[in-house]
Design a protein with these regions (language model features):
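N-terminal glycine/serine-rich phosphate-binding loop of ATP-dependent small-molecule kinases
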Residues: 1-25, 53, 81, 137, ...
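Glycine-rich beta-strand-to-loop/alpha-helix junction loops that act as flexible
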Residues: 5-10, 141-142, 193-196
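Carbohydrate-associated surface elements
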Residues: 32
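Active-site core segments that coordinate phosphate-bearing ligands/cofactors
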Residues: 36, 43-56, 61, 66-101, ...
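Short, well-ordered beta-strand elements within core beta-sheets of diverse protein domains
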Residues: 110-114, 135-137
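A conserved helix-loop-beta module that forms one wall/lid of the active-site cleft
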Residues: 128-141
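Glycine-rich phosphate-binding loops at beta-strand->alpha-helix junctions
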Residues: 140-148, 168
């Protein structure tokens, strides 16, 4: 019998809310170009190595840290008005039960978290001029957040259900579902394929070495106190964009048709590195 509900989503994106619980505008998608140049501005204040040593996250221009800096530079009035930042799954939980927390695995995608302390990197954020008052309490996956609001339950048929935070980052949930008993051991690896392909291993402490920085890998939160040491690899987004481009030209293909045509095409006629900036 199903008795609880929780949400997981992609990482890094967020909403800003007022003290009255109102959305201060719609959330930006992480592919929005507003973060251009933010990473370089940060490195002028905090060396790249120091930032990795504290946050353990690979450097991607859409990390929440760079999104927030862009938000503050472009819309300082909104940032000044904001009372709370909620990541997308945390916002769903708020809509369901009114909780204002950040589940650990989704918070770990932000580059605003101290990887070793598992708390917000307050000193770093203050140095960069970001308002730490926006940041909610961090809770581990499995935390009971409350009952579904009566008004919501009546509309969607969840009377009596409890909201429980899952690993709210979708990859963390996927890795948690791997059928192994060797939690946190280097006896297995995973590839989670979707818009992105995430390849990595599960470890018990973040890997913050110079070599990890050099190859730009990331330490994201997992379940049971683990970390997901992984690399972001461009995934099926390429196929999605190909299909979209074909449709714009009046040619509609299903995904199985695209796979079939790709298999029939002459191999290695072109070589594209989708991660080349």
């Amino acid at each position: 019998r199903v008795v609880s509900v929780g949400a997981d989503t992609w990482g890094v994106d967020y909403v800003l809310m007022s003290r009255k619980g109102e959305l201060l505008g719609l959330p930006y998608a992480y592919r929005d170009a507003r973060t251009q140049g933010e990473m370089e501005r940060v490195f002028r204040k905090v060396p790249r190595a120091r930032l990795f040593e504290q946050t353990g996250l690979q450097f991607l221009p859409f990390n929440t840290l760079f999104q927030l800096l862009a938000h503050q530079r472009q819309h300082p009035d909104v940032m000044a008005t904001a009372h709370r930042l909620l990541f997308i799954p945390d916002f769903v939980h708020w809509a369901l039960c009114g909780s204002e927390v950040a589940e650990f695995t989704i918070a770990s995608t932000s580059q605003c978290l101290d990887a070793q302390q598992r708390t917000w990197a307050v000193g770093l954020l203050k140095k960069l001029g970001l308002p730490v008052k926006l940041l909610p309490e961090i809770v581990p996956p499995g935390t009971r957040l409350g009952r579904v609001r009566t008004s919501v339950a009546a509309r969607i048929g969840l009377e009596g259900w409890e909201v429980v935070a899952p690993p709210a980052h979708d990859t963390a949930s996927a890795v948690a579902a791997v059928p192994t008993a060797d939690t946190g051991k280097l006896t297995w690896a995973y590839i989670s394929s979707g818009t992105w392909s995430l390849m990595g291993v599960e470890v018990t402490r973040p890997v913050l070495t110079a070599r990890a920085l050099e190859v730009n890998i990331t330490n994201e939160g997992g379940v049971d106190g683990t970390y997901r040491l992984l690399k972001n690899i461009m995934g099926l987004w390429l196929v999605q964009q190909c299909r979209k481009a074909f449709e714009a030209r009046g040619r509609t293909f299903t995904y199985p048709e695209l796979v079939q045509r790709a298999g029939e095409a002459a191999p290695l006629r072109s070589l594209v590195n989708p991660d080349d900036p």
